[in-house]
Amino acid sequence: MSGRDNRGAGGGGGGHQPLSNAMGKLKEKLTRVGDELGYHRVESNLSTSNTATSLDTILPEDPFLFPQVSPQRHPQTVRTQRLLEDEPPLSFRPLLEDDDINEPPTQQPHRSPLRASGSLELTPLPPPPTSLEIREHRDRQQRGAQGDELQRSKQSLKGSRVSFERRDTGNSNTNNNKAAESSDEDSFEEKRTGFQQQKATSVDHKGILKDLKHILANDNRRQFQAKKHVSLDVKGTRFLQDLLKESSSEEEFHKTRREFQGRKHQSLDPRVTFKLDKVLQGSSTDSDEEGEDAEHKRLIHRPKDITKPVIIDLKDLESESDEDFLTSRQHFQQQRSISTDSRKSRRLYEMDEMGNKRGENIRHAVPFVRQITEDGKPKLEVYRPTTNPIFIWTQVLAALSVSLGSLVVGFVSAYTSPALVSMTDRNITSFEVTQDAGSWVGGIMPLAGLAGGIAGGPLIEYLGRRNTILATAVPFIVSSLLIACAVNVAMVLCGRFLAGFCVGIASLSLPVYLGETVQPEVRGTLGLLPTAFGNIGILLCFVAGSFMNWSMLAFLGAALPVPFLILMFLIPETPRWFVSRGREERARKALSWLRGKEADVEPELKGLMRSQADADRQATQNTMLELLKRNNLKPLSISLGLMFFQQLSGINAVIFYTVQIFKDAGSTIDGNICTIIVGVVNFLATFIGIVLIDRAGRKILLYVSNIAMILTLFVLGGFFYCKAHGPDVSNLGWLPLTCFVIYILGFSLGFGPIPWLMMGEILPAKIRGSAASVATAFNWSCTFVVTKTFQDLTVAMGAHGAFWLFGAICFVGLFFVIIYVPETQGKTLEDIERKMMGRVRRMSSVANIKPLSFNM
């Protein structure tokens, strides 16, 4: 130990010589190897005066291979204490272009902590990394580089977005010109989509608002809102007057507004905006100032009673006129900008696209606001454009003509109620009318109506709706004159049979004509007229019968068809019948008369032709055999059941023999007055039923109707029973009238209109025509049975027995409604047919048409 220490601490010469020789050999070896490999050697600072020697090498490229060296220092020196000559060299790197060969080391060599004692510290290199560690290290480096690249891409994208927004908004006029000159709409749409995607990713709302305000040449926010919301938001128009004051002229304001609208429509829809941009250029580059002023005044001073819709097709937007641009912009606004519901706006646009392909516009478009009036102030006039303006007067004339025929039908139906009283009076009548003959006078009319209903179907197909109705006017007159001039019962029966035959034809043809001529928008209102006029005819017969005998009343009945006959000559045949006969030009003329000469009837005409073609394809030769199929029997049975319980409730017995019933009841109120009261209630109850039928539901009203009729019929039966066999009921003379009023109200709410309505709802479209004829014929058959047998029932069972029988039938009808009748309120015909039959067919043209019913 002391020897080694003495050597280590010894003086200069002897102890250092072997070390110097070894280091010299090592240096030469490293130099030779480096020259062979093409590496640059950095001069080492070999000091013979120190106990340790340094070799300076440059930091290699990959710091992972030499973790003891920090990668932030370049170039760096690495001190290696190696003394053995057979040790491998430490580190070299290739010579770089920017390396300075003569550059001295920037850091002092690392001295061994044993330097003072003259000893050397041997520090071996760490073991070289495995291939797996090298691969993982390089993967981490690659991911780090990708992350840096992604961050730089985000920064670049943000800068590009801001630059793109400013270019697209600030230089919108240039972009519009380029878009208008280019015919490649796909490129325009791609540009718009990219702009929207970049704009949607932005969270810098203040920057977007600033760019939008930059569009308006640095206008303040109030002006921006005023221009943006003009003709879109009614509230925004209050800024219009202030905006006009700030503009030097109205022309300048309109020019600025049009330019703004054109820019604002940018990137909303390329197919429309692409062409609006062209129109904008044409409208804003008009060099003729006088022509522009005249055109502007013509646009501003528009008529106040604008009712004709603006019909615009995309192909018409190529026009360069200011008027075309203005109307195009309005049409575009009403589809997109008024509604705040984006889904609704898209649906409106899709509807319009479909309509343009078919040559049609939206029937119910969104209302839009006329922008300014003559004095520049906002005028909030809203109108709703449709496919065709409703030219109401011709349709009212058609409905009135048909309704006068309905009035005649009502008068004829109620004739026997007041007429039989005077007809059976030998002091008034020159011939005798027995009780059996009287029952035939009342019952033959429904029997003839059955025959007329069967014959009416083929007649309206071969002669036409109008001609068939017109053909009934003269027989109505003849039948009334035959009754008025009768000298025996046979003439009265002939007149009643002829009148009943005409009633059967009219009850089928009148609603068909009305349904095929009136537009859907007013069909509900005008469709009420025939029923109302029919009840007016009943009331007129009751009132006139109070003052006239049967002969004079028949003369009045002969006069009623005259205005009906005259008006029927003024109206045309239905367009649908002309289409079914292949007379397209006649159908076009009929539509022009009904819809107005200025209306576009081509879309409706094409719809009629398509509907007729579908009906022809679905038509079969054996339509009556279709009724016997299992799927069709259920709806047909329900319809026939409703007709049965409607007539077996005794309504026509009450209507036909009202005066006689009150006379037999011994009421304290005059029988004729009671009859008039019943007629008034019957007339008013029609409107009550129409109001409630779509609110309360069909089945609820049928329940109420059944219960009301059951109670009143049993009370009436009890009254007549007490009058014939029991205590004195003279002080209850008001009871029959009260029961009749409640009975009529109950019938009119439910079993009066609903069987006819549900007949059109539940019958399948394929058999609707033939099934409706069967149901109508069955209804007339039941009417004949009731009216013919009522007086026989009163003789055989007494009045109380007849009313109790009708009440019992109504009680059974209540359970029929509960078990079998479906609820059809608020359901489409397709849904009802799907539920009833499991399939859906195209609904026919008379889906909502029902034969006339005025409580018969």
Swiss-Prot record:
GO terms for biological process: trehalose transport. Gene3D superfamilies: MFS general substrate transporter like domains. It is found in: Cell membrane. The chain crosses the membrane at residues 390-410, 440-460, 473-493, 497-517, 528-548, 552-572, 636-656, 673-693, 700-720, 740-760, 767-787, 801-821. One of its GO terms (molecular function) is trehalose transmembrane transporter activity. Residues 1-389, 461-472, 518-527, 573-635, 694-699, 761-766, 822-856 are cytoplasmic. Residues 1-27, 62-202, 326-345 are annotated as: Disordered. GO terms for cellular component: plasma membrane. PROSITE patterns: MFS, SUGAR_TRANSPORT_1, SUGAR_TRANSPORT_2. Its main location: membrane. The modification Phosphoserine is found at residues 247-249, 319, 321, 844-845. Residues 69-80, 170-180, 329-340 have a biased composition (Polar residues). InterPro entries: MFS_dom, MFS_ERD6/Tret1-like, MFS_sugar_transport-like, MFS_trans_sf, MFS_Trehalose_Transporter, Sugar/inositol_transpt, Sugar_transporter_CS. It is a multi-pass membrane protein. Keywords: Cell membrane, Glycoprotein, Membrane, Phosphoprotein, Sugar transport, Transmembrane, Transmembrane helix, Transport. The keyword Cell membrane applies. Residues 411-439, 494-496, 549-551, 657-672, 721-739, 788-800 are extracellular. Residues 133-142 have a biased composition (Basic and acidic residues). Glycans are attached at residues 427, 549. Belongs to the major facilitator superfamily. Sugar transporter (TC 2.A.1.1) family. Trehalose transporter subfamily. Low-capacity facilitative transporter for trehalose. Does not transport maltose, sucrose or lactose. Mediates the bidirectional transfer of trehalose. Responsible for the transport of trehalose synthesized in the fat body and the incorporation of trehalose into other tissues that require a carbon source, thereby regulating trehalose levels in the hemolymph. This is Facilitated trehalose transporter Tret1. The gene is Tret1.
